[in-house]
A protein has these predicted regions:
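N-terminal alpha/beta PP-like core and its mobile active-site loop of ThDP/TPP-dependent enzymes
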Residues: 1-337, 373, 377-380, 460-463, ...
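A general structural motif
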Residues: 48, 107-109, 187-199, 257-261, ...
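Glycine-rich phosphate/pyrophosphate-binding loop at beta-loop-alpha junctions
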Residues: 7-12, 447-450, 469-472
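Phosphate/pyrophosphate-binding active-site segments
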Residues: 134, 170, 180-183, 202, ...
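Catalytic phosphate/nucleotide-handling subdomain of diverse soluble enzymes
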Residues: 418, 422-462, 466
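Active-site diphosphate/adenylate-binding microenvironment
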Residues: 4-8, 12, 25, 30-35, ...
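Short glycine/threonine-rich loop-to-helix capping motif typified by GTGT followed
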Residues: 33, 221-227, 397-402, 450-453, ...
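Thiamine diphosphate
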Residues: 105, 112, 456-550
Length: 582
């Protein structure tokens, strides 16, 4: 048995079923072991290591299991970093395995001599270099356990010559007994102290206008959130990663928060006197109640994130579902439902506006039309992954999450490009579910080569590309946040439908809003991997639900300072936002 065999068999013992990676001479020993164990563990070969890291992150997000990615020494390991930071910042358990050069040539400027164990110090909560064959079992067990326990990244750096060394008894130190470690991981059953629960209940019972902010940590607590909202008469505001925490047809939710959120959500944050945060580290604190405005209670699994975004009075450390179940019996039902009713009335108006914008027949086609037509046709088991950019606005606002669906994106890192890798990982994890990527042309083109990975492995994913030939989010940030004319954001057009065909998939194109629904239906019903290229208006602004005076001023400044499309942009913005701008 080689050292690489010990690694692979340890991963199998930990229940790892798939590894995402790209071969290289720095991991040849591991590749050989994966070949000989291919009936027990599957290798998904990607075209870029960044895709492998994103796939491991997406796999872990959608399954709750450990995601594993593999890269060779030097540049291969470096390419993993962006996807690993995505996992780190969103609190996702991922194990990265990288090669290193020969153990006695490390640090001698040999080929691909990059000290990846040093490079990964910041991104990984566990980060070790293998020192010999008898070291592998201990380190692999500890790496897997740490990633799962801390919901974070672990990294193993494995010198290439050690990978192929035979495991021999005489190599062991006297304290390193064979099999003294195990593949056991126990999920925490931690519940808050009863005194903390009562103190939290007292605050929530005293509140007159209670709002709930739900994030990714609340995804498994839908029923408990709705029960809490009913008792407290509280609207549920959702962070992006919590899009599926409560379905959008729930009478309790006001949808998203922040730049991509809804007006009723923002009003709930501005007017509440009590805030319950459930499993969220939503980073844009300017959209939350001002410090001192509301009394705060937070439910959070990670103690170090307690009070991170808002000065809460009580922190309840524990799983969202179980903690809510313990807290609910201590609450009194509020007779005054006016705060919730105002939010519900606001949401009725909001959805009417969203539908009106999404059913326009203007040409060029509006991006909202594409999102709306997709949302209507998604199956109840759909898993929808999004990229970062203006695409996120339409994903957040125009696609209504239904119970049973899953949604995710790069929440805190806000990286471009994970939409496609997330979707492939979801399809591998759930081969019978509908898996869709909703992406922009800018983000998709960064890792578009891996569409051929979906073709190779016969993954029937669907990729909706909203094509506006611009880096839209950067463009609008230049204008609205800084008052500058757009610069450096135009993208040279790519024929994505032809690209799909070149990869062995199927491509569709739609430009006419009258044809969007029919084309979308045909595209979604195709049995194999497919791309829908939806050509949309590049001048459609993803403006906030409530435009601040400063933003309006900067917007006007950018037009006055020579914005090349100022006339068309002004007309489009005014037609949408006149009520907020006057």
């Amino acid at each position: 048995m080689t050292a690489a065999d010990v690694l692979v068999e340890s991963l199998i013992d930990w229940g790892v079923e798939v590894i995402f990676g790209l071969p290289g001479d720095g991991i040849n020993g591991i590749m050989e072991s994966l070949r000989t164990h291919q009936n027990q563990i599957r290798l998904i070969q990607v075209r870029h290591e960044e895709s492998a890291a994103f796939m491991a992150c997406g796999y872990a997000k959608y399954t709750g299991k450990l995601g594993v990615c593999l890269a060779t020494s030097g540049p291969g390991g470096i390419h993993l970093l962006n996807g690993l930071y995505d996992a780190k910042l969103d609190g996702i358990p991922v194990l990265a395995i990288s090669g290193l050069q020969f153990h006695d040539l490390i640090g001698t400027y040999t080929q691909q001599d990059v000290a990846l164990d040093k490079l990964f110090i910041d991104v990984a909560v566990f980060n070790e270099r293998i020192m010999g064959p008898t070291h592998v079992e201990n380190i692999t067990d500890l790496a897997c356990r740490t990633a799962l326990a801390y919901h974070n990244v672990a990294h193993i750096a494995f010198p290439v010559d050690i990978q192929e060394m035979e495991l021999k008894k005489r190599q062991r130190s006297k304290r390193n007994l064979p099999h003294h470690t195990s593949d056991v991981y126990s999920r925490s059953a931690r519940l808050p102290d009863t005194r903390d629960l009562q103190e939290a209940a007292d605050i929530l019972n005293a509140g007159k206008k209670v709002a709930i902010l739900a994030g990714r940590g609340a995804l498994n607590a839908t029923d408990e959130l709705e029960q809490m909202a009913e008792l407290l008469g509280a609207p549920i505001v959702k962070a992006l990663l919590g899009k599926a925490a409560v379905p959008d047809d729930s009478p309790y939710t006001t949808g998203g928060i922040g730049l991509l959120g809804t007006r009723p959500s923002q009003e709930a944050m501005e007017d509440c006197d009590t805030l319950l945060i459930v499993g969220s580290s939503f980073p844009y604190i300017e959209f939350m109640p001002k410090p001192g405005q509301a009394r705060g209670v937070q439910i959070e699994l990670d103690p170090k994130r307690m009070g991170l975004r808002y000065p809460v009075e009580v922190g309840l450390v524990g799983d969202s579902r179980n903690t809510l179940r313990e807290l609910t019996p201590l609450l009194q039902r509020k007779d005054d439902r006016s705060f919730l009713q105002a939010a519900q009335a606001g949401m009725k108006d909001w959805w009417a506006v969203m539908e009106k914008r999404a059913t326009r027949r203007d040409k060029p086609m509006k991006p909202q039309v594409v999102a709306w037509e997709l949302g209507k046709r998604l199956r109840n088991d759909a898993i929808v992954s999004c990229d970062s950019g203006t695409i996120t606005t339409w994903w957040a606002r125009q696609i209504k999450a239904r119970r049973g669906q899953m949604y995710s994106l790069s929440g805190t890192l806000a990286s471009m490009a994970p939409g496609l890798p997330y979707t492939m990982a979801a399809q591998i994890a759930y081969p019978d579910r509908q898996c869709v990527a909703f992406v922009g042309d800018g983000g998709f083109s960064m890792l578009m080569a891996d569409f051929v990975t979906a073709v190779k492995y016969k993954l029937p994913i669907k990729v909706v590309i909203v094509k506006n030939n611009t880096l839209g989010q950067i463009k609008w940030e230049q204008m609205v946040f800084l008052g500058n004319p757009e610069y450096g954001v135009d993208l040279y057009p790519i024929d994505f439908a032809s690209f799909a065909l070149a990869c062995g998939g199927v491509g569709f194109t739609v430009e006419d809003p009258d044809q969007c629904g029919a084309t979308m239906g045909e595209f979604l019903n195709h049995p194999g991997p497919a791309i829908l290229e939806a050509v949309v208006d590049p001048l459609e602004p993803p403006l906030p639900a409530k435009v601040k005076a400063e933003q309006a001023l900067h917007f006007a400044e950018s037009l006055a300072r020579g914005e090349p499309n100022r006339k068309e942009i002004a007309l489009t913005a005014i037609s949408q936002k006149v009520r907020e701008l006057i």
